[in-house]
Amino acid sequence: MSELALIQKAIEESQQKMTQLFDAQKAEIESTGQVSKQLQSDLMKVQEELTKSGTRLFDLEQKLASGAENPGEKKSFSERAAEELIKSWDGKQGTFGAKTFNKSLGSDADSAGSLIQPMQIPGIIMPGLRRLTIRDLLAQGRTSSNALEYVREEVFTNNADVVAEKALKPESDITFSKQTANVKTIAHWVQASRQVMDDAPMLQSYINNRLMYGLALKEEGQLLNGDGTGDNLEGLNKVATAYDTSLNATGDTRADIIAHAIYQVTESEFSASGIVLNPRDWHNIALLKDNEGRYIFGGPQAFTSNIMWGLPVVPTKAQAAGTFTVGGFDMASQVWDRMDATVEVSREDRDNFVKNMLTILCEERLALAHYRPTAIIKGTFSSGS
C-alpha cells in the first residue's frame, strides 16, 4: 500500500473516531451536564492523530510538488497522487473515493471547544458595602431586660436669687418624665439546600457575612431614621430638636448653616461631637471656594480628614440628601444591646427535614435611649445655600 493510501486510511479512521466521540460527548452533556475526563482524554488523542496525519499529508504534498523523484519534470500534486493510486491498483475493477483533510479544529462546540476549560476565578465577587458609622457615634451599653426605663428632666425653672434677711426665699421647680425604650428585634433569613452548603463550604461563610451586613445596614437606618411606630426604633432624627432657622443670615452657605447648628447644640449646655450628612451634601461643602478660587476646607485633603468646623463629618447614604444632623451624640443617646447579632441554622423549620433544606436566620435585639434630645439638632439646607 502506497504512502498516500496509508495516510488516507489513517485520516478516515481518525475522522470516524472523532465523530463517535462527538456523539458520546453530546450524550454525556445531555445526561450529566459535563464531559468526563476519559472522554476528554480520548478526544485529545484523536486530535493528535489527526494532526500527525495532516502533517504527513502536507509533507507528501510538498515532496510531490517539488518533483523530488524527477527534478527535470515537475508534476502537480493531483498528477502525483494519481500515479500513486495507479501503482497500488491490483487490476480489478472498483471505485475509489478520495477524501481531503479539510476539517479544521476550532473552539466551537462541534470541534475542540469542549477541550478548552475556562479559568475559574476563586471566591464570589461581592458588591460595594456601605461603611456603617451611626452606632459608633453613640454611647454603648448592655441590658438583660426587654425594656429600659429612665427618668428625664424636662423643665428646670431656676428661681435662685440673693435674699435679704428675713425675706421670703424664691421657689424653683423641676419637671420630670418617665421614658421607656423597648427592645426591638431586627432579623432576616434565607433558605439553602443542605447539598449546596455541604458541597460549597465557602458559600456558608459568604451567606453568613451577607446576612450580618444586611442586619447592620438595617440597624444603621433605624438608629438614624426610625420613626418609633410599631416595632421600629425611635431614631436620632425623630427625637432631634428642629434647627433654628432664625440663625440664618443672607448669603449663608451650607457650611455656615452647619456652624449655626453647632452653636445651637451649645445652647443645650453640651458640645457637638459630630455631623451627619448625605455624601452628596458633604461633597458640595468640601468643594466650596472663596472669592479667589481657593478651597475653604482644604481642597483635595478635605475628604481624607472629613473634618468641618473642628468636628468629624459622617457621610452616609442613610441620611437623606439635603438633611443634616448635628449633635453631642455620645451624651444625648445610647444603644443598649439585648442580644448581639447571631446566625443560626435549622433543619426543623417547616418541611426542611424532608426536603433537605436549611433555614439560616440572622437576628439581633437592641434598644435606643435618648437622654438629651436638645443636644441633637436636625435641619434641611435651603435651595439657595
UniProtKB/Swiss-Prot annotation:
Residues joined by cross-link Isoaspartyl lysine isopeptide (Asn-Lys) (interchain with K-169): 356
InterPro entries in the cross-refs: Phage_capsid, Phage_capsid-like_C
GO molecular function, one term: identical protein binding
Signal peptide: none
Keyword tRNA processing: no
A GO term from the CC aspect: viral capsid
UniProt superkingdom: Viruses
PTM section of the record: The major capsid proteins are covalently cross-linked.
Keywords, sorted A to Z: Capsid protein, Coiled coil, Isopeptide bond, Late protein, T=7 icosahedral capsid protein, Viral capsid assembly, Viral release from host cell, Virion
Keyword Coiled coil: yes
General function of this protein: Assembles to form an icosahedral capsid of 66 nm, with a T=7 laevo symmetry. Responsible for its self-assembly into a procapsid. The phage does not need to encode a separate scaffolfing protein because its capsid protein contains the delta domain that carries that function.
Name the UniProt record assigns to this protein: Major capsid protein
Lineage: Viruses, Duplodnaviria, Heunggongvirae, Uroviricota, Caudoviricetes
